[in-house]
Regions:
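Structural preference for solvent-exposed beta-strand-turn elements
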Residues: 1-380
Length: 380
């Protein structure tokens, strides 16, 4: 475990004053990582460490660690731990004034803000797991806006099955100045490619980032113009932005060869207004089988017809006029999977690239040719 803090700090006890909004912001950024129902009580706590003119706020679940630094009036340096959820709940209700923290004997902590006073039990700071070692040497850099967009366009495609660990995250790849992010659950796939510029050319890099780390990473993104640095060391990778860092274990295992899944011979291109398809599909899917979510897509010259027909729920049908003059084709698709894709495409028009009822549907758009999503077909 961690080294015990110096005796001089123990005898004087940590004391800090910090702006309530600053404190709340720091706790909010890491409290999602703290374990609330784990077998190690210390993991439900945050580690607060004060030195010089700042305080660090740290959380971990042993797989992911997050730490941020915030300006504070440090009267006495030291460390303390407090229950993450209780601290967050208290800070959220406090007035927007200065918060005064004082550590007492046996790890108790007094919290004062305005007329409000609390006395909270802590745990020994030395029991808190050490923060994972990570490299400060950046392997690549990208804007917050780029990172947020790439996660948004692929996050939904990850597998919810915890036993398929290699699919419980996203693949981050850098090759020839391009950054790629890929997600798949075996029934669908989403891949987005973005240009990183000449500065990122170098050896190919490939990392599997866990789902929880990605979700926590998105919480840190406040300024679209800010820059994230990415580094990796041994089994850990780190995302750094300003005074905040998230360190995560890499997922072990081999990600599927996603390039083989992307169809290259889907010659039937059906262009349709994204919002029109989205709204019609939502309506028809109301009567889709609750397990399979299947909707039948019948495409012919001038129209696309969406149909569901189940004995238990009944039938639904909606026809949409389209400017298509190719050969007819029918395919069964999971309505939720298609809607997930439509929710993240920003273009007004989407393209359904089809071949036949036994082949996957490739969904693209004209304005973003570096984003592709594949939905596997279902038996009609």
């Amino acid at each position: 475990m961690r080294n015990k803090i110096p005796t001089v700090l123990e005898t004087r006890h940590m004391e800090v004053r910090i702006d309530r909004d600053t404190f709340l912001d720091g706790v909010q950024k890491v409290q999602g990582i703290a374990e609330t129902k784990g077998t190690m009580p210390i993991l439900s706590h945050l580690l607060l460490a004060a030195e010089q003119d700042r305080i660090s706020i740290q959380a971990t679940d042993l797989e992911i660690g997050s730490k941020g630094y915030y300006s504070a009036n440090v009267i006495t340096a030291g460390e303390m731990t407090l229950n993450s959820k209780k601290l967050f709940d208290i800070l959220r209700e406090l007035p927007r004034e200065e918060v005064h923290l004082v550590k007492e004997d046996n790890h108790w902590v007094r919290v004062k803000c305005g007329k409000s006073k609390f006395r909270l039990p802590g745990m020994p700071p030395e029991d808190f797991p050490p923060f994972p070692e990570f490299s400060q040497d950046s392997l690549m850099e990208f804007s917050s806006k780029l990172l947020k967009e790439m996660i948004r366009k692929t996050f939904f495609a990850q597998s919810p099955d915890e036993t398929r660990q290699v699919l419980n995250g996203l693949l981050l790849e850098r090759e020839n100045g391009k950054l790629k992010m890929v997600g798949t659950d075996g029934h669908r796939l989403a891949v987005v490619r973005r240009d990183l510029g000449d500065t990122s050319k170098g050896e190919k890099l490939s990392y599997l980032i866990p789902k929880k780390a990605l979700a926590e990473l998105v919480k840190l993104i406040e300024d679209d113009e800010a820059t994230f640095s990415f580094s990796a060391k041994n089994n850990h990778m780190a995302f750094m932005q300003g005074d905040q860092v998230i360190v995560s274990r890499k997922i072990d295992g081999k990600f599927p060869n996603y390039q083989q899944v992307i169809p290259s011979d889907n010659k039937l291109q059906v262009k349709i207004n994204r919002n029109t398809l989205q709204q019609a599909l939502k309506r028809v899917a109301l009567l889709a089988d609750e397990k399979s979510k299947m909707v039948r897509f019948d495409i012919q010259s001038g129209s696309i017809t969406l149909t569901t027909d189940t004995t238990e729920l009944g039938e639904a049908r909606e026809e949409i006029a389209i400017s298509y003059s190719g050969e007819g084709v029918s395919v069964g698709l999971n309505a939720k999977y298609v809607l997930d894709v439509l929710n993240v495409i920003d273009d007004e028009e989407v393209i359904l690239n089809l071949k036949d009822e036994k082949s996957s549907c490739l969904i693209t758009s004209n304005t973003d040719k570096d984003y592709q999503s594949i939905v596997m077909p279902m038996r009609l």
